[in-house]
Amino acid sequence: SAFQPVPYITTYGATKAFVLSYSRAMNRELKPMGIRMMAMNPGWVRTEFFNHAFQTNNRVQYFNYVQEAKDVVATGLKDLYKTKKPYSVHGLPIRNQVRLVKLLPHSIVMKVWINQQKKAKNNNNLTTK
């Protein structure tokens, strides 16, 4: 959500984009003091959020490649201490998605997102892959 516009969860996506931009800028500002700041961009993580999302009529119902929190944290800590990356992305599917949305026009990215959500809604697909 931080790397692409996401219709129907607009505020969520905008907030994620802000946090990514803020973290990258703060990381640069804090560098002379030896302080690192890194944004976590894990994709979907199995948390209490899912219990609430499944109980609403929210249009966003398709949770692709849900990660376990402990795995996301392990990747984040590894990236924080062993790389100079300004952000951490857990899992190959999400890393590939981040790369792809940087190359495609936002209009196409949003169409794909909307079609994915419509497909999930039509199939009552509330499960994860």
Language-model region placement:
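Active-site helix of classical SDR
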Residues: 15
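Catalytic tyrosine of NAD(P)H-dependent dehydrogenase/reductases that use a Tyr as the general acid/base
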Residues: 12, 20
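Active-site segment of SDR-like NAD(P)-dependent oxidoreductases
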Residues: 1-4
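A short, exposed helix-loop element centered on a Lys and neighboring polar residues
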Residues: 24
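C-terminal tail/cap regions
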Residues: 63-65, 71-129
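SDR active-site lid
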Residues: 27-92
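Active-site loop immediately N-terminal to the catalytic Tyr-X3-Lys motif
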Residues: 6-10
